[in-house]
Amino acid sequence: MHTLDTVDASSLRTDIPDFRPGDTLKVHVRVVEGNRSRVQVFQGVVIRRQGSGVRETFTVRKVSFGVGVERTFPVHTPVIEKIEVVTRGHVRRAKLYYLRDLRGKAAKIREKRENRETTEA
């Protein structure tokens, strides 16, 4: 079993920022079309993060032209160029599936306020 752990540890990424459900992310995804490769940005709210280690995934939801779009990404996949945290959200749940039923302002997530002591120190 230790050999599996070492293989898993070698394929983990270290450039992933700390993010939680409720945070708004910009996920830069490498898309291959034929022989060309380009980077596509997917910005939305993290509605879940599950698993651990190499198998850890997160789901990002956005509303595009009135249609809700959700994409699930493995955290440690090489397809992701980078992840940017746009805003930190203040939520009380680990899985935000209830956002699927909300529209407009009701689907808005409160922004987390930073403590002054931690930012000044």
Curated annotation (Swiss-Prot):
Q: Name one GO cellular component term.
A: cytosolic large ribosomal subunit
Function as written in the Swiss-Prot or TrEMBL entry? This protein is located at the 30S-50S ribosomal subunit interface and may play a role in the structure and function of the aminoacyl-tRNA binding site.
Keyword set, alphabetical order: Ribonucleoprotein, Ribosomal protein
Query: What family is it from?
Result: Belongs to the bacterial ribosomal protein bL19 family.
Q: Which protein is depicted?
A: Large ribosomal subunit protein bL19
Domain of life per record: Bacteria
Task: Say yes or no: keyword Nucleotidyltransferase present.
Answer: no
> Is Ribosomal protein one of the keywords?
yes
For this UniProt entry, the molecular function terms from Gene Ontology, in alphabetical order, are: structural constituent of ribosome
Q: Give the originating organism.
A: Acidothermus cellulolyticus (strain ATCC 43068 / DSM 8971 / 11B)
Task: Write down the InterPro entries for this protein, in alphabetical order.
Answer: Ribosomal_bL19, Ribosomal_bL19_CS, Ribosomal_bL19_sf, Translation_prot_SH3-like_sf
Q: Which GO terms describe its biological process?
A: translation
